[in-house]
Structure formats: C-alpha cells, structure tokens
Amino acid sequence: MHALQAKILDPRLGRDFPLPEYATPGSAGLDLRAMLQQDTVLEPGQTLLIPTGLAIHIADPTLAALVLPRSGLGHKHGIVLGNLVGLIDSDYQGELMVSCWNRGQSAFTIAVGERIAQLMLVPVVQARFELVDSFDSSDRGAGGFGHSGSH
C-alpha cells in the first residue's frame, strides 16, 4: 500500500467524521466527505464546490488521483461531479474540493459529513510526442465516434 501525505484542514474530520477510508478490502476508492458548515440544498441544475476538509500531497510523480462520483448519488438522486472527473496531480498540495452538480429534477440536501465522492490513486505514464509523416496502418484506421460498434 502506498503512503499518501494528508493534512486535516477541518478538525471535525477524524473526530466527528471518519477520515477517508476504503469501505471494503476490495474497494478501489477512498470516500470523501462534504465538510460543510451546515446541510446545504443543491437545487436542480445547480453546481456547488464542496470542501472535503483534507489537503493531500501525492509526491510520487508516477501516481495521480482521480476524484470520481459515487454511483448511488448519481443513479438515485442525479448528483454527479460538475467536472465529471477530477484529476489531482502528484505535486498538488491544496485542499481537495468536490464540484457537485444536481442534474436531477428535484432539490437534494447534502448533509454535513455525507460521502459525496471517492478518491482513487492511479499510475501515471508520461509521454512525449514523436512527430511522424504517417502511421503504420491498423484495422481501425481513423474511424471514431462509434466506428467499431453497432450503435
């Protein structure tokens, strides 16, 4: 398991609410919580930037973190991430913030301490462009946007 440097910015985190943790031994993401000052209503179509009370520094340039939505919030309530996926670079050291967007038809209350997203560490492979005049041919070629499927 990798070590991840973290600073608690909201004293309720770790005291009143658990620190981010894996829900099961097979979980890929650590749950992030809404460290709001009070319960907040997210109206249909509204986007809100929500603090997690936690700053991290991954430090290892071969790793990054993704902030991903929680499937139940999106499927049952229409609450998804405003930026769809958040990318946290290894050299970022600020507070993790979650952009929540209510794409549903009903207002939704985000409770203080509610699990609103998940953080997943992923490997990073950096590349440099190698400029060429042409590519070796492939079965797919330049086909895209549904080219390989039936719909």
Curated annotation (Swiss-Prot):
Coiled-coil regions listed: none
GO BP annotations, alphabetical order: dUMP biosynthetic process; dUTP catabolic process
GO MF terms held by the record: dUTP diphosphatase activity; magnesium ion binding
Signal peptide: none
UniProt keyword annotations, A-Z: Hydrolase, Magnesium, Metal-binding, Nucleotide metabolism
Metabolic or biological pathway: Pyrimidine metabolism; dUMP biosynthesis; dUMP from dCTP (dUTP route): step 2/2
EC top class, as a word: hydrolase
Enzyme Commission identifier(s): 3.6.1.23
Reactions accelerated catalytically: dUTP + H2O = dUMP + diphosphate + H(+)
SUPFAM superfamilies: dUTPase-like
Obligatory cofactor(s): Mg(2+)
Binding positions (substrate): 70-72, 83, 87-89, 97
Similarity field: Belongs to the dUTPase family.
Annotated function: This enzyme is involved in nucleotide metabolism: it produces dUMP, the immediate precursor of thymidine nucleotides and it decreases the intracellular concentration of dUTP so that uracil cannot be incorporated into DNA.
PANTHER family cross-referenced by the UniProt entry: DEOXYURIDINE 5'-TRIPHOSPHATE NUCLEOTIDOHYDROLASE
Protein name: Deoxyuridine 5'-triphosphate nucleotidohydrolase
